[in-house]
Swiss-Prot record:
Transmembrane segments: 22-42, 109-129, 139-159, 175-195, 208-228, 269-289, 303-323, 324-344
UniProt binding sites for heme: 271, 332
EC number annotated for this UniProt entry: 1.17.99.9
Name this polypeptide is given: Heme A synthase
UniProt entry keywords in alphabetical sequence: Cell membrane, Heme biosynthesis, Iron, Membrane, Metal-binding, Oxidoreductase, Transmembrane, Transmembrane helix
Biological source species: Chelativorans sp. (strain BNC1)
A Gene Ontology molecular function term of the record: metal ion binding
Gene: ctaA
GO terms, biological process: heme A biosynthetic process
Pathway this chain belongs to: Porphyrin-containing compound metabolism; heme A biosynthesis; heme A from heme O: step 1/1
Catalytic activity of the protein: Fe(II)-heme o + 2 A + H2O = Fe(II)-heme a + 2 AH2
């Protein structure tokens, strides 16, 4: 049997330290909820083809939407200059434009908002000495990822403003994955500050839980490629694709590797395979943990994680069979975040709470 990893031994938490951890944890959970909302609104923006409706990046002035008919006409005129309007939405009315504008505007507003939700409390906790030393580099790293995400978001939008009629699937998948990394990192820190009970997890359990998180992240990246290519429309049957387990034409482009990123049929096929892999890994993890650590909190979490993956798989199948309706597709995206968040919390819990380190004077 593999030896258990001992939870870090730390000095007894004082009442003040316990309160500080509680407030920092509450703040981070608020950040997580905001991130969840951003990703869902981003998904709706993609599903409604709204992502290119705002053709400029104005970090400050962009908070204020058009306020009068003249400003709306000016905003619409800018949109009419890009290929998406010329080739896809020619003849769109101003009212129809407003419909797609508000999705993109809401997504950008939430993205700006989460910066304040994260940065201002971080500054407060820092200057008041409520942050333990080991938390500071972790939180600064998350803040840096947030700044990078803003730049990647505009880089993604810019890909659809000159020649394409949509954004690059490479950039969209990157944008989604970075958002999930921020979500993942925030969840890990929050869970590390929570009290832990029970015996430490075995090394094998902890390692498997980590790689399961990685597998979920990879699957989300593949889902980003599916969204970017509208690959969910390629085959709307299950379990077969075009009447076969392995459909024809998966590698019709040259070089062959390009199909993994640019052929909608191949991208959907790989995403399906990824789903089966995650499902099998979650099942294996649940069975192995139940055998190695019966009646432990780790085993119960592993079983619950497997059940969440099953629900996500069912929603994914429904999304295909129903030809990607917006509500079901958004439920699929939301469930992906729930699976990722729970998998991350589960992995972090196998390592125990952070050791207590007093904030530097």
């Amino acid at each position: 049997m593999v030896a258990a990893t001992e939870f870090p031994v730390s000095p007894m938490l004082t009442d003040a330290a316990r309160r500080n951890r509680l407030w920092v944890r509450i703040w981070l959970y608020c950040v997580i909820v905001t991130l969840f909302a951003i990703v869902l609104v981003g998904g709706a923006t993609r599903l409604t083809d709204s992502g290119l409706s705002i053709t400029e990046w104005k970090p400050i002035h962009g908070v204020i939407p058009p306020l009068g008919e003249a400003e709306w006409a000016e905003e619409f005129a800018r949109y009419q200059q890009i290929p998406e309007y010329e080739q896809i939405n020619k003849g769109m009315s101003l009212e129809e434009f407003k419909g797609i504008f508000w999705w993109e505007w809401a997504h950008r507003l939430l993205a700006r908002g989460v910066g304040f939700v994260f940065a201002l409390p971080l500054l407060f906790f820092w200057v008041t000495g409520r942050l333990e030393r080991h938390l500071k580099p972790k939180l600064l790293g998350i803040l840096a990822l947030g700044g990078l995400q803003g730049a990647v978001g505009w880089w993604m939008v810019a890909s659809g403003l000159s020649e394409r009629v949509d954004v690059s699937q490479y950039r969209l998948a990157t944008h989604l994955t970075i958002a999930c990394l921020i979500f993942n990192a925030t969840m890990a820190v929050a869970r590390g500050l929570a009290p832990h009970s029970g015996k430490p997890a075995l090394d094998s359990t902890r390692r498997f839980a980590f790689w399961l998180v990685v597998a979920v992240l990879v699957q989300i990246y593949l889902g980003g490629l599916v969204a970017g290519l509208d690959a969910g429309m390629a085959y709307n049957t299950w379990p077969l694709m075009d009447g076969a387990l392995v459909p024809q034409g998966l590698f019709e482009h040259r070089p062959a590797w390009v199909n993994l990123f640019e052929n909608p049929k191949t991208v959907q096929f790989v995403h399906r395979l990824g789903a089966y892999v995650v499902l099998l890994l979650a099942l294996w993890h649940a069975i192995a943990t139940l055998r190695a650590e019966p009646d432990s909190t780790h085993a119960r979490r592993a079983v619950l994680l497997f059940l969440l993956v099953c629900v996500q798989a069912a929603i994914g199948i429904a999304t295909l069979l129903m030809v990607v309706p917006m509500d079901v597709a958004l439920a699929h995206q939301a469930m992906a975040l729930i699976v990722l968040g729970f998998a991350t919390a589960h992995w972090r819990a196998t390592r125990g709470a952070y050791p207590f380190m007093q904030a530097a004077a």
